[in-house]
Amino acid sequence: MAFPAWSWSWSLKVALPSRSKSFAAFSLSFSGHHIIPPVSTTPILNRPSQSYRRIHCTPLRQQQQPLKMPSATTPPPSPSPEYRVLIVGGSYGGLCAALTLLDLSHGKVARFNFTENAQPPARQIPMQITVVDERDGFYHLIGSPQALASEEYASKTWTKFADIPALQSPSVRFVQGSVSSVDCQTKIAQILDTETQETRKEKYDFLIASSGLRRGFPTVPQSLRREEFLSETRTNVDAIRHAQDGVVVIGGGAVGVEIATELRTLYPTQKITLIHSRDRLLSAEPLPTDFQDRVASVVRDSGVKLILGQRVISTATIETEGGRKIWHLTLTNGRSIYAGHVMNAVSKSVPTSSYLPQEALDQEGYVPILPSTQFPPTVPNATQHFAIGDLASWSAIKRCGGAMHMAYHAASNAHQLMLSADKPEYITLEKSPPCMGLALGKTAVTYTADQGTRDGESEHELWFGKDMGYSICWNYMKLGEPWKA
């Protein structure tokens, strides 16, 4: 996981707990990579820019200059009582977009704007911000490896939207449900409400798509309500504790290595085995081999048994005479592995973009955004549609830090259109190099283009703090500060 750090030239380096995200150090990545602001009690605005560069890995520059607008556009409706903004997805990106709009609409400098001497908007603009999410709250995805192995920590990682002080504003409402379709021409979305099980039409003036990727367990919990999530965690923790024949983690990507080392840290007497089909861990990531090798070394040193170059071709359960269940795994070389519990961290993440029109997507289902985070110009009303986070096709490893940075851009640019549809002053993204931080037990292995591969407990403290980046993200978004108009 890794997190976002920003330095003004607008060079935002994102290193959130990778899990990117990816994560998981402000790997605001997933699967294990995230990017987050540095751990410090000093307000980020008062810190020297040098401290930002130290931990930021994604140079994304914010440019205050006009950007050519896509041709396929219709000016947003002007004198309406208030602008209607629909945000699809309430994770890192979605919440940052909502908070940015909330600040700007009330004539405040956005909380994510670290420009020196930044000026507030010239006037307030009434808005109604609707956030639609399948879950009933914000889940700290970066913390999944620990949350699914610790009931105490799990309780901290999921906060119902109704319990987040910063979002308790009349201008913001949350709908637990899913968006089934979006008509960009008419600006109407179809929303299936989880509570009523009814589909309703939602008209909007601006849309920000931040629904991310569909990921399986154990990358993310499958529960949609906090109470169900805690029950899901309890079940997994019980299985780990009672696995007399050890625990096997399948898949050596970011999620797999973080889960394996976290289990070893939390349950030091438990036998933990990590199986990966390739000869190197993190084989799917665009990272140097010295980073992959360093991760493998740390994993082994933690006490995890590492099996590389072997694929699990079959799994079967065996019932013992005492009623105990044992897993039998067969590898490609014919070797048999037995375990009391198996966690499969091999799953292909799929974009949750089925609700968007085909002309807005590439062949893999991602939105090929412009540097302004807007939809491609072939889409009707493209300038009023934005995509951020994992759903967007953009450079760099996907992580939460990048999603938060993109959210600030999308919300700011939407606000610019509200201020002046004819001459908006967009801020734009720049391509960024690969960056990742992995929380491996009490240590972390990180990679940035400027510092290369690093590891150690100090790196863990810098990228993840003491709670897998939870406090870093929570405080960065200022979620605990009650909203004041």
Predicted regions span which residues?
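Eukaryotic N-terminal targeting leaders
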Residues: 1-84, 106-126, 322, 482-485
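FAD-binding core/adjacent interface of flavoenzyme oxidoreductases
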Residues: 44, 50-59, 65-86, 168-248
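Beta1-alpha1 glycine-rich phosphate/pyrophosphate-binding loop at the start
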Residues: 67-175, 261-287
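C-terminal, flexible cofactor-proximal segment of oxidoreductases
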Residues: 72, 81, 177, 397-402, ...
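Glycine-rich active-site loop/strand segments that organize a redox cofactor
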Residues: 122-155, 209-239, 447-448
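A Rossmann-like FAD-binding core segment of flavoenzymes
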Residues: 170, 174-177, 181-182, 269-371, ...
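FAD-site-proximal beta/loop scaffold in flavoenzymes
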Residues: 226-244, 336-405
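Rossmann-like NAD(P)H-binding beta-loop-alpha module
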Residues: 243-271
